[in-house]
């Protein structure tokens, strides 16, 4: 059973998170108002009959609350939930990105991407091009 103090701390963090929708912040505020009385001092009297009251608010969950901009893009990525590749623009590998890094570890990461069945073809293609660029830079 979740610790009520930690649940409240999470709800309070939601209020201060800029990546959370206004609707989610309002629900967190409502939750804090209805559940904080006495619980902050360790009094768990709000748990009636041993039931876990922490999940009562999930019944009215609105999937649109996760989308926080006009385009309907998930704040953590695109419509599919995937985060854009930070290497999408410009050169795939810049020299200053490799400074201070073990080049073999970087190459290993790209090779792992190419062999990972959970990675898109587009990401595998980018990894292949990045490997080629690294090879060109290290040979030069």
UniProtKB/Swiss-Prot annotation:
Residues 24-33 have a biased composition (Basic and acidic residues). Residues 1-88, 110-140 are annotated as: Disordered. Residues 54-71 have a biased composition (Acidic residues). GO terms for cellular component: cytoplasm; cytosol; nucleus. It holds the Pfam family Con-6. Signal peptide: none annotated. It comes from the Eukaryota. Residues 34-44 have a biased composition (Polar residues). InterPro entries: Conidiation-specific_6, UPF0654_domain. Belongs to the UPF0654 (con-6) family. This is UPF0654 protein C22G7.11c. It comes from Schizosaccharomyces pombe (strain 972 / ATCC 24843) (Fission yeast).
């Amino acid at each position: 059973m979740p610790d009520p103090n930690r649940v409240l701390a999470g709800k309070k963090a939601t209020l201060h998170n800029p990546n959370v929708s206004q609707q989610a912040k309002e629900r967190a505020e409502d939750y804090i108002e209805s559940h904080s009385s006495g619980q902050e001092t360790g009094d768990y009297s709000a748990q009636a009959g041993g039931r876990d009251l922490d999940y009562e608010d999930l019944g009215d969950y609105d999937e649109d609350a996760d989308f926080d901009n006009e385009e309907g893009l998930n704040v953590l990525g695109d419509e599919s939930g995937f985060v854009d590749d930070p290497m999408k623009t410009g050169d795939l590998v810049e020299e200053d990105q490799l400074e201070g890094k073990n080049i073999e570890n970087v190459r290993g990461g790209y090779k792992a991407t190419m062999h990972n069945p959970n990675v898109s073809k587009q990401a595998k293609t980018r990894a292949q091009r990045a490997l080629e660029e690294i090879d060109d830079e290290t040979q030069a």
